[in-house]
Structures are given as structure tokens and as C-alpha cells.
Amino acid sequence: MAHLRLGNIIGSLSRVPKSILDVGYGDGSFLKVCSNIIPKCYGYDVSSYPAPDGCEIVSSMTDQPYDVITFFDSLEHFEDIEFVKDLKCTAVCISVPHCHNKSDEWFENWKHRRPDEHLWHFDKDSLVNFMERMGFVLCSHSNLEDTIRKNPDQEEPNILTCVFRSFKRYESSNS
């Protein structure tokens, strides 16, 4: 999955990022793959996981600029997501459960509905609208993670992945 995610970012940007911050890095598998080709790799997590070799843990997502910031299955867990407007980066990659919300009954029975855990629910349009308000424009979108995770009987996309570019340009030693 980590290679697929990194390939999507590189393909969407048409280049290898100079630095990357993975928010909610967990076991560090994505950062470990990134560290093979990205010079500066950083992780932010609410839990105290060890950072993979060659990667650094940071205590804030908004203090310094990064080329790319990723939220793989993590953005929907934050109580207040307005901090996204304060991110200093050229691009953001977000992967979230794809909420189709066809009816109250559908939503009530949705497998990703976890009221105490998933605090935000997005479909493509709602995620794009939110990110535009935060200062980002859609670069690419896909359901690429479904190629690995998807149940063959499932009719609709399960995981939504989008790459956004910032309206602003950040320059620093990290980006």
C-alpha cells in the first residue's frame, strides 16, 4: 500500500517531493518507503510511535513548511479540521473513507460509520469544497486503494484519495 500511495503522489505531482510529512504515520511503513527516495521525511502522530530510520518526528503539523503533507486515514479523526488552512506545503494528499450517503438507512449501516472515531465524512465534492476553502485546488482523485482493499462484490468505491496543490508556494530548507 505504501508504494501505491507514494506512486500516486509522484504521478500526481510529476516529480519526487523534496520533503514529506505523514500525519498519523502509525507503524511508519509509508515513511519507510518514502525515505528511500525523498531526502527529508517527517512524521506526526498523536501516539508515540518510533520513527523509521532516516525520518524525524515533529510535534506540530503547522510550524514549518513541507513539500507534501499526507493524511492517510487520519483527517477524519480530528475534531477540528480547520487547521488545514494553516498547513505550509505545496501539496496535500488525503485518503478517507468514501461516504456516498444515499439515505439515512445507508449511512446508519455504513461500514465506516464510527461515531466516536470518524468525526468527518466526505465524498469527492465535499472534500474538494472543503479543501478549496482551505486554499487548495484538486490535482487528482482516485479510488486507487480499492484495487488492493476492495471486496469484489462491492459496488461502490470504498476509499477516496485526492491530491491537492496549494494556492500558495512555500520555500524553505524542508521543501
For every predicted segment, state its role:
Residues 1-68, 72, 81-87, 105-110, ...:
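Conserved N-terminal segment of class I S-adenosyl-L-methionine
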Residues 72-75, 95:
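Residues lining the SAM
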Residues 78:
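Catalytic P-loop NTPase motifs of RecA-like helicase/translocase cores
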Residues 89-101:
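Conserved beta-strand signature within the Rossmann-like core of class I S-adenosyl-L-methionine
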Residues 93-95, 139-142:
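Conserved active-site loop/cleft motifs that coordinate metal ions or position small ligands
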Residues 118-134:
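Short alpha-helix
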